[in-house]
């Protein structure tokens, strides 16, 4: 640290762009959504441990899924609204890594919300529901890593602490390995896997939506992390922007 002498009578304020009503609520609302997905993750993990189907806990999960997704939606909308009238932030959406970090859990949460309704009412998509529940929280932790570690170049980068990034990355990998390892062990043991449905139906539409949202999430993930992988392999430096997305 450098000593300032004489000490100023008043400290320097925040960057004027950050002194905004939208920024008071934008980050907390996002993290409330992330934390809400932790409850769904815990419920699904408990069901896997005790060999219960997703349908048995679907009613209990529904409120938490809706709660998490709504808070995440409001947080993203507030951030986009703020970026729109602040010069230099790329309009409503810039496809910045930090923006994508909140978009991926939002997409998975939307898929989980629809899949959960089908599981609760018709007993279908039990595996989809469990998988999306685990992925939504895993990507929430990954999103926190993107924001707080400074691993990816971003106009939203608020910290460059490698230690914090390593801890978050370790949490992400531990949760992912344990949860999805248990999911793989339980796969095929649930009777819901034998439930049939007409493809041209509401369930068929939900299945198509699940596939599209999964593709959107994977595409966003690749576009976000490919530059970091490219640089880590010493292949040079590239930038993936809005034309890709």
Where are these regions (language model features)?
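Polytopic transmembrane helical bundles with strong interfacial aromatic enrichment
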Residues: 1-245
């Amino acid at each position: 640290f450098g000593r300032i002498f004489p000490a100023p009578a008043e400290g320097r304020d925040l960057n004027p762009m950050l002194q905004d009503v939208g920024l008071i609520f934008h980050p907390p609302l996002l993290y409330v959504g992330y934390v809400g997905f932790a409850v769904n993750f815990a419920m699904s993990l408990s069901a896997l441990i005790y060999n219960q189907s997703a349908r048995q806990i679907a009613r209990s999960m529904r409120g938490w899924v809706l709660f998490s997704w709504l808070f995440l939606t409001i947080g993203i909308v507030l951030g986009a609204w703020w970026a729109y009238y602040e010069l230099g932030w790329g309009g409503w959406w810039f496809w910045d890594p930090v923006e994508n970090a909140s978009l991926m859990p939002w997409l998975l949460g939307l898929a989980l919300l629809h899949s959960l309704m089908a599981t609760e009412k018709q007993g279908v998509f039990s595996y989809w529901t469990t998988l999306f529940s685990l992925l939504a929280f895993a990507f929430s932790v990954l999103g926190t890593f993107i924001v707080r570690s400074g691993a990816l170049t971003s106009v939203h980068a608020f910290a460059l602490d490698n230690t914090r990034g390593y801890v978050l990355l370790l949490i992400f990998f531990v949760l992912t390995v344990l949860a999805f390892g248990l999911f793989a062990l339980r796969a095929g043991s649930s009777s819901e896997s034998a439930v049939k449905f007409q493809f041209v139906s509401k369930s068929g539409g939900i299945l198509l939506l699940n596939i599209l949202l999964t593709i959107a999430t994977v595409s966003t993930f690749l576009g976000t992390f490919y530059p970091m992988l490219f640089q880590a392999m010493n292949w040079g430096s590239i930038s993936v922007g809005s034309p890709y997305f």
